[in-house]
Structure formats: C-alpha cells, structure tokens
Amino acid sequence: MEKISYGGWKNCYHLSNDHIELIVTADVGPRIIYLGLIGGENIFMQFPDQMGVTTSDEWLNFGGHRLWHAPESQPRTYYPDMEPVLVQEIDHGLVVTQKPEPTTGVQKQIQIALSPNEPEVKLIHRLINHNLWGVEAAPWSISVMSPGGIAILPLPPRGPHPEFILPTSRISIWPYTNLSDPRFKFFEKYIQITQDAAM
C-alpha cells in the first residue's frame, strides 16, 4: 500500500497484489475510484471534468464505487461527499470513514480488504448513526462501471417444486425500469446486465 496522487486528487491510496490494484480517494469520499487487473484498464467509470474536484455547490458523481443510504431521497441521499475522509490502515487494506453528515447525522464507512494472493477484494459498508434518535436506512453500495462491461449477478441455487416453495430472490423494480431493455438477460443461474450507454 502506498499514498499517491491520482486524477488531480493529491491524497489517494494505492493497494495492489499480484493480480489487481485499486485506488481510494482520501480528499473526497469514501470512494474507490479505480479497480482493475495489474496493467489493465479501470473497470470503473470516471468523469474527466470531475476528477480532482473537492468543492462544488452540487453533488457530483465522480464515478467509481461509493456508499449511499437508502431509500433514495432528495436531498438526503445526494449529500455531497466532498470532504476529506479519515483513512485507517488495516491488514491488507483500509477503513475509510467520512465525517458525519451535518444534514443527516449519518456517517459512511467502507472497509476494504484486498486478498494477499487472489484477484479479490472484500468490502464492508457501514452507516453509523450519530443522532440521538433512530434512523431507518440501509447501506446502498453503488459502482459506476466503464462502458462495455458485463455484470453477472449469480442467483441462489435452484430447487425442485414442491420441496422449495419459498422465494430465494428479490428484484426491485422502479417506475422507470424497463425489463424489455436488451441490456438485461435472464438465465437460470444468473442475470446478466451489459453496460451500454447507447441503448
């Protein structure tokens, strides 16, 4: 692990093993802005006009992988993550913690653990409530992928009827979701989604 400058942000952390590498911003976030095979391309989308930005009157996407709190709500969900984050080094990784949001009292944290030997990274997402009252919310991790990628979403093991009569999966459908979109493909053991902005 090393501290580096990346994309206009002066305080970033580079983690790598023999297979993959990732870059975490400390100037904004918590956010992973780069993930790829060693010598390969970043699988995350980046928006060049937003790289290195640390101040704005509005929320910016930046790309990469981030943490929100669900359910989505304006303006709560879109609190700008443009302040420095606390970075704590752990074995084979980092814990990246945002200051509590003044508008919500919620603090976002991502724990990042890179496998020492495999092309694998494990993330733990946490929402920490600093209010004197309970907050009903859920961690919502979002990855903005580069064009041309394919996501494979494994489904739980199948089973015969009538032994297995309870549902094992849920799909959330928004009012604007179009299940006939050709980027969605449904198979017996997985769902495939193709990233193609032209569609």
Report the location of each language-model feature.
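Surface-exposed acidic/polar loop and edge beta-strand patches at domain peripheries
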Residues: 1-199
